[in-house]
Amino acid sequence: MGSIGAASTEFCFDMFKELKVHHVNENIIYSPLSIISILSMVFLGARENTKTQMEKVIHFDKITGFGESLESQCGTSVSVHASLKDILSEITKPSDNYSLSLASKLYAEETYPVLPEYLQCIKELYKGSLETVSFQTAADQARELINSWVETQTNGVIKNFLQPGSVDPQTEMVLVDAIYFKGTWEKAFKDEDTQEVPFRITEQESKPVQMMYQAGSFKVATVAAEKMKILELPYASGELSMFVLLPDDISGLEQLETTISIEKLSEWTSSNMMEDRKMKVYLPHMKIEEKYNLTSVLVALGMTDLFSPSANLSGISTAQTLKMSEAIHGAYVEIYEAGSEMATSTGVLVEAASVSEEFRVDHPFLFLIKHNPSNSILFFGRCIFP
């Protein structure tokens, strides 16, 4: 398999299988890449069985040369962490083309001594950090401190990240991971073309949405065998693209969810499937925000020791008993008209008249936002209603 992109994609689908069981007929949005990166920070300090389980769940065990290269003082092969750091630095560097804010941090109970070399390693490899707080004597103040940090990091978008009661005096360590994204399209949708139309949630139920429109040349794949089609919408940077996987039928989502896999997705989005076609594209405004307690998901995937008294985090702390108490992930994605270049009105008028094919996103679909250079899935989602 051999790469971070493949490992994060495989983890992405494992996670989706778990989430869809617990979130039937609900929107889903999460960032596999951001979850893998913060789990990798924990992984640096995990030892023995805890480490082996983590390696399997995040598919690091399949990365070529993973165990061999450079056993550094950070206790694991540096190559994986270096390539993750490169991808994350690339994606999170300030850009005019999109806003992406990431708030990822570990918070540990201050009575646990944290090894200075661990702090050094996560700083070098991830620009990451672990902060000690007093859960034992001031759990609610710790929660408020965490929430205000997440809010600041995401420019006020993600508020009240940890709910009251989510930490208590018994809390030992919390993994916090929140990510916000709003991109600028390579080709903008024009505000005046947006209209209110019904979005058909089921055969019986529909709700009004703001539907954007543009006509132009887009990469599209028709997957007749699966009764669905795929549209790629590039963001202005050229490095990120959104892929919309749209079933032909209103009720076709379940079949698509059952079929999708890492192999299928790479086949469907390969260059011999995706072709440039003139297309009228209708895409709804979207504002999807979800939050998950990842503890149950990760345990179900096989990462059991980390959250139990059997945890071995001796690379983080000399305390024998340290375990992860909670892992919380939140993702927020907004989809609007804004683009870097406006389509010229005359060109569009001519083109629209000559275009007969439509890609009309007016019923439930899957979508993903991909970092093309590393082939990594930054966001994966299911939209039941935008």
Swiss-Prot record:
Pfam families: Serpin. It comes from the Eukaryota. Gene3D superfamilies: Alpha-1-antitrypsin, domain 1 (2.30.39.10), Antithrombin, subunit I, domain 2 (3.30.497.10). Keywords: Acetylation, Disulfide bond, Glycoprotein, Phosphoprotein, Secreted. Its main location: secreted. It is found in: Secreted. The modification N-acetylglycine is found at residue 2. Glycans are attached at residue 293. Belongs to the serpin family. Ov-serpin subfamily. PANTHER family: SERINE PROTEASE INHIBITOR, SERPIN (PTHR11461), SERPIN B4 (PTHR11461:SF186). This is Ovalbumin. It comes from Dromaius novaehollandiae (Emu).
